[in-house]
């Protein structure tokens, strides 16, 4: 009996210690918040941008939880989209969602990210099983690539079909403000390549374009993207608001910190909610 009590005391002590090793905290306005606060805010939104670290298991878990919980509230009014799927793959994505092709064929023919099976397949499967519309919002990477080499002008030479997978041209671009300015500054004067920022902008503009193209009043559009694309309500959000001003947008962003007991100054204003993950967290790939 004494041995059992001793074991229970050891296990209890270990459990208390483990509870102090928190993998993440959620912040809003520099103060501790919660997942329920995120969910409550998102329920009334028109657009929700979940900015992820692409290899963060915490971000991907919360992405799935938010999807399933918002579906319980919005049902057929919920639309989902993601940076990880390119616009010219919309047909094959629809064919898979509508059971016209199987999972094996979809994975063979769609250009999927390396972490699709672990991180994005659960989202796709839920939308498939629940008949939720899923929009491939990103520009085909080959077009972003040529912009990074030759600038926006090269897009004018594309066919009408190719242009149908891109935001309407010309896009409004200013590299002296916002995230594109920051990108060029981070590169440094010696290594700054203006066309790299332009490639980022054409991605953001295209994602905003396809989000708005599929959105109808009363919908809630939940979009998954790398955090850089929506941090500080910039990037995709800037292009979206330029076209549709009187809407409620919620931005969630993911950051990593060594110490998550308080939010670092550089991370405070990145989003409406900040998911602050410990740097020791394992990665999905």
Say what each PLM segment does.
Residues 4, 17-45:
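N- or domain-start disorder-to-order transition segments that initiate the globular core
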Residues 4-14:
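Sec-dependent N-terminal signal peptides
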Residues 25-38, 165, 170, 205-210, ...:
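Alpha-helical scaffolding within the catalytic cores
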Residues 43-78, 84:
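N-terminal, post-signal-peptide region of Sec/Tat-exported proteins
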Residues 53-57, 85-89, 140-144, 227-230, ...:
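Solvent-exposed loop/turn segments at secondary-structure junctions
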Residues 78, 91-214:
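A substrate-binding/cap region within the structured catalytic cores of diverse enzymes
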Residues 78-85, 250-255:
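Short internal beta-strands
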Residues 206-215, 219-222, 229-285:
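C-terminal regions of proteins
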């Amino acid at each position: 009996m004494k041995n059992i009590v001793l074991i229970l005391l050891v296990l209890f002590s270990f459990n208390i210690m483990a509870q102090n090793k928190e993998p993440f905290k959620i912040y809003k306005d520099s103060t501790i918040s919660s997942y329920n606060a995120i969910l409550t805010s998102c329920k009334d939104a028109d657009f929700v941008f979940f900015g992820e670290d692409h290899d963060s298991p915490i971000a991907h878990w919360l992405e799935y939880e938010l999807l399933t919980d918002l579906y319980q509230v919005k049902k057929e009014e919920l639309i989902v989209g993601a940076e990880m799927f390119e616009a010219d793959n919309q047909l094959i994505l629809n064919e898979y969602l509508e059971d016209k092709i199987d999972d094996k064929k979809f994975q063979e023919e769609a250009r999927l990210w390396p972490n699709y099976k672990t991180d994005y397949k659960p989202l796709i499967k839920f939308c498939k099983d629940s008949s939720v519309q899923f929009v491939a919002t990103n520009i085909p990477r080959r077009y972003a690539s040529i912009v990074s080499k030759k600038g926006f002008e090269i897009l004018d030479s594309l066919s009408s079909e190719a242009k149908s997978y891109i935001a309407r041209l010309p896009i409004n671009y200013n590299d002296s403000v916002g995230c594109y300015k920051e990108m060029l500054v981070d590169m440094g004067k010696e290594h700054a390549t203006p066309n790299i920022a332009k490639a980022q902008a054409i991605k953001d503009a295209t994602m905003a374009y396809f989000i708005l193209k599929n959105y109808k009043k009363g919908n809630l559009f939940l979009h998954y993207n790398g955090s850089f694309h929506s941090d500080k309500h910039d990037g995709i959000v800037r292009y979206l608001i330029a076209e549709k001003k009187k809407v409620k947008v919620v931005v969630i962003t993911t950051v990593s910190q060594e110490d998550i007991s308080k939010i670092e100054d550089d991370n405070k204003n990145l989003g409406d909610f900040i998911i602050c993950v410990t740097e020791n967290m394992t990665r999905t790939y």
